[in-house]
Amino acid sequence: MTHSLLSKPGVKLHFGLNTHALLEAITQANDIVLHAAIYSNFADNAVGQLLLQRLQSVSFKQLTLLKLEPTSPWRDEFATILRPDMPLLEVERLYENSRHWCAELKRQFPEAVNLVSTQALPLQPILLIGDRLFVGHYAHSHTTSAQGLWIEFDVIALGLAPNSLIDWFYSGVTTEQDSPVVITLSRYVEECRRAVGDLWYQSVIALDKGRH
């Protein structure tokens, strides 16, 4: 039996990344996980500025940045997906800008920022912002993922407990949680968990025991 997510409260479709909704979610979140390949745009835009403000808040707990370091079999092809009209050398500069931005956040906030380099092939951009989840998609297109379709999930409006997403990220989803909503959302969280890697993840779980 299929279930229409669009008939449920807590699910919105956006034609292009809804920056206003994203900023609103960041303002309210104390735990954030970003799995978006590169973050060069954040270096000088409102999202990056707000993240910097949140990191300075005493209530903020953790920002996990999954930073892509692509491998050769798909590196060039993925570059054309990220920036279709940009030469490969220019895309590499974006990667370098992204590395610098991430490293600077880690330097300024060593306890609050988990910076993770991953070589896992990204399947979609995923922004886990507290109790809201923003998911886009990559495509072989002349437009970027930011201009494509995005889905916004509000887990509270969907009837899940507060902090469900971040709890799944740290601890996984139990097999008992098998509702259609949980199964759908957990796939995106599992994608982030897989990109993180087992060794790093075990250290995060150990650290998290002292925070919750």
Predicted regions span which residues?
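Cysteine/selenocysteine-centered motifs that mediate thiol-based redox chemistry or coordinate metal-sulfur cofactors
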Residues: 160-212
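PLD-like (HKD) phosphodiesterase/transphosphatidyltransferase domain
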Residues: 1-79, 166-171
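HKD-type phospholipase D/PLD-like phosphodiesterase module
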Residues: 70-124
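HKD (HxKxxxxD) catalytic microenvironment of the phospholipase D
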Residues: 113-154
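Hydrophobic, Leu/Ile/Phe/Ala-enriched alpha-helical segments that form helix-helix packing faces
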Residues: 51-58, 98-109, 196
